[in-house]
């Protein structure tokens, strides 16, 4: 009786889940247009699919108020057809461009009433990370040959402190699944979320200095499969921003108060934890601190 083929990983076969930032409020303030950015991204995806015929690419659009799957190479009937369709783009990305246009239009309609003009809002990173992990989990449970999965976040929108808990949950889930999260941040200010995601999961974080050469950055840094990364020199983080967001006002803080029961973080002292309901004994702490102050101030005889 023949042995049943066991599920195993392939060294040089990659499953790349790309999280594409489509926040229109961010792209209206950049030096590079979204169409130019998209041309770099599609050329990069074309290169990834060309490196190995078994490679898979999934693209998730990350909008302001929603996120959705817009491309899956495993479902494309003309996978491997790299001829141009007359628009300068490979023919395999025809469905991607169509679904992306529909998604952007729908996302703009949903976000009209929620947009504030005082700052650029964040994109729904927590939702797209969750969708990426769900897709990877489905791949793990189907088929006999699993490609090496990884997530690449292409983001320019600033971090949303209100998404802190959901984003961190996704990061630790990816760490448990041994799925690295690569990040390429093209915004003005660096992203603490993406820095922590790449650091915790063993991915690569990079901020391109020249967006005109984005394709070169993507191909030289992020096109490398996980097996080959041990033989190439990739950018290493100089410093990681580990600041957290408070649960009360949803803002990034350097120092704060932590509930010893549920580990919720607050920027100001509260008598009661709003998450688990634990009562903080600040009065005892005040008495202890005042007693220690009196001991320090006691005159020497």
UniProtKB/Swiss-Prot annotation:
Intracellular or extracellular location(s): Nucleus
Question: Might you report a single GO cellular component term?
Answer: transcription factor TFIIH core complex
Entry keywords, A to Z: DNA damage, DNA repair, Metal-binding, Nucleus, Transcription, Transcription regulation, Zinc, Zinc-finger
Disulphide-bonded residues:
none
- Quote the InterPro entries the UniProt record gives: TFIIH_Tfb4/GTF2H3, vWFA_dom_sf
GO MF, one example: zinc ion binding
Q: What is one Gene Ontology biological process annotated in the Swiss-Prot or TrEMBL record?
A: nucleotide-excision repair
Is Transferase set as a keyword in this record?
A: no
Does the record's keyword annotation contain Heme? Answer: no
What family does the Swiss-Prot or TrEMBL record give for this protein?
A: Belongs to the TFB4 family.
Q: How does it assemble?
A: Component of the 7-subunit TFIIH core complex composed of XPB, XPD, TFB1/GTF2H1, GTF2H2/P44, TFB4/GTF2H3, TFB2/GTF2H4 and TFB5/GTF2H5, which is active in NER. The core complex associates with the 3-subunit CDK-activating kinase (CAK) module composed of CYCH1/cyclin H1, CDKD and MAT1/At4g30820 to form the 10-subunit holoenzyme (holo-TFIIH) active in transcription.
Chain's role: Component of the general transcription and DNA repair factor IIH (TFIIH) core complex, which is involved in general and transcription-coupled nucleotide excision repair (NER) of damaged DNA and, when complexed to CAK, in RNA transcription by RNA polymerase II. In NER, TFIIH acts by opening DNA around the lesion to allow the excision of the damaged oligonucleotide and its replacement by a new DNA fragment. In transcription, TFIIH has an essential role in transcription initiation.
Give the protein's recorded name: General transcription and DNA repair factor IIH subunit TFB4
